[in-house]
Structure formats: C-alpha cells, structure tokens
Amino acid sequence: QMEDEINVANFAVGAGYAGARSACATSGGGFALMTEVVGFASMIEAPVVMIEVARGGPSTGLPTKTEQGDLNQLYGASQGDFPRAIIAQSSIEEGFYLGQEALNIAEEYQMPVLLSSDLYLGEHFETVPLYDFDKVPIERGKFYPDKVPDGFLRYELTKDGISPRTIPGAKGGRHDA
C-alpha cells in the first residue's frame, strides 16, 4: 500500500512500463489526484488500467448515494489532448471481463484505460456464474519482453500509429522515453 493515490498511480504506470499487466483503483476524490499521472502514462505510451469507482455528489461524495457523476472527470483527466479509453461496467460479472479487456486495450494501444464503476457495484455482494478465464484471451500487442528485433525503435512511426515496445534491460531495447 502506498502513501497516497499519486504514488499508487505512478507505481502502476511504472509496472506497465516494466512489462507487467498493471492496474490500480480509487474513488472520485482519489482519481482527481491521479490525473497528472494519466497524462504521463499517455506521454510515455505506458499501458495501465485505472479503475475509478464513482460516489454520489461533489468532493468526497455522499457515502450512501450512487451515481455515475465522475464521467466528465474521466474525459478531462490531465491536461492536453491525448488518447485514452474509457469503459463503464454495468454489472459485477461484466466488470470482471471488462477488466481483462481493459488490460488488453491498454497493452495493444499503449495508453491508459479508465474503467468506470459506481458505489453500488463497488460495494455490494452478488453470486455470479463461475468465471470463464479463457473468455478474454490475453493480448499483449507489439511487445518484445525478451528478444528485441534488430533496428528496434521504441517510438517508430508506423502505419497503424502503434510502435513496438519492450521492457527495461531487454537486449537491444535501449531507448529514451
């Protein structure tokens, strides 16, 4: 456990940059502190999933009210124009599978993915069917964790706009970020 949401977000981005499938979670006020890191993750093209559980009302929120009032905050997280994906779950079961999809999208497109939930979904208990762990296959995108091809350029201009990535310490993968 980190001392604040800012460091939680930075550690999650660092883990994604280092090759781990990475996610962190917070609620509305905590996400406000994480917004600078959302922009940083996009700038260095680090895959990360940030789960934001909305509470009702402004500031620290109302502890017993549910609403999806943080959607605008997700749209405007950090300054400048940069890519991000925003996904909202509508059930507990869907949240499990969307979490896997969010990790895949983050890695394939090398960007932050913001997964939105709300107080009701975040705090209630529910019996769900046994999860199918093979339903959403793991997709890592253009990722070279071990063997990096000759001529590797981390921020290469490609036809699809997505450059290959590697992890720190991979032979032939040295680059500036």
Language-model segments: residues:
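Thiamine diphosphate
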Residues: 1-76, 85-106
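Ligand-binding clefts of soluble mixed alpha/beta catalytic domains
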Residues: 57-60, 69-79, 137, 141, ...
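Short acidic, glycine-rich surface-loop motifs adjacent to enzyme active sites
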Residues: 82
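Flexible, low-complexity linker and terminal segments
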Residues: 98-177
